[in-house]
Amino acid sequence: MGEELSVGFRFYPTEVELLTYYLRIQLGGGNATIHSLIPILDVFSVEPTQLPNLAGERCRGDAEQWIFFVPRQEREARGGRPSRTTGSGYWKATGSPGPVFSPDNRVIGVKKTMVFYTGKAPTGRKTKWKMNEYKAVETASVSTIPKSGSSRAFDRRPTEAYAIERNLPSNGVETSSRATISTSPETSHSGGNQVDLPVNATTITQSISDMVDELSQPFWEWEQMNWS
């Protein structure tokens, strides 16, 4: 895993690949190779601008997307609402979670989108940071929400480019412990300050910050995750 990739090659798995391959492996215990690509991180315990430097070795230099496995919080495991507040702001869900489908039209996960706001709720200021959270499902029912694993991905591609959202099944992945992908719709900060953008393939810019509200994220079942 240490060799350099040729220019133009990136670790950019699709939603189906995150849910049916990477998240499944993590739910089965994970391994060092997978964690070098998608590390385990409580994305809500750090600021969005820190995420690029905490990403896996194949995403660390990426200016568009970062993916993490996010452990389930104790309060969430007890049936409570997870804390999405950081020192400088909070993550706010936008829209409703949606199913993610496999190529043969089966629901394989759930996708939920969040946008980062600076300040305190409900008067925070929306930024271009976007997070897509995916959870895997064990059945083909769209209403089924996975119990253990999720992943989050952060992307900073321009909102226009990210507007073409993909639908994921209930067993989605969030680049974080839950396969979670963070995205930042602003493109103006793609330069040396790429760290300020979310893992999603969007760039963070004030001019397109309003477009982030249309994103949504799915969740995985935490009971099935092995975080050791």
From Swiss-Prot:
One of its GO terms (biological process) is regulation of DNA-templated transcription. Pfam families: NAM (PF02365). It is found in: Nucleus. This is Putative NAC domain-containing protein 61. The gene is NAC061. The NAC domain includes a DNA-binding domain and a dimerization domain. Residues 5-156 form the NAC domain. GO terms for cellular component: nucleus. It comes from the Eukaryota. InterPro entries: NAC-dom (IPR003441), NAC_dom_sf (IPR036093). Keywords: DNA-binding, Nucleus, Transcription, Transcription regulation. Residues 80-89 have a biased composition (Low complexity). Residues 168-193 have a biased composition (Polar residues). Residues 77-96, 166-197 are annotated as: Disordered. One of its GO terms (molecular function) is DNA binding. The keyword Nucleus applies.
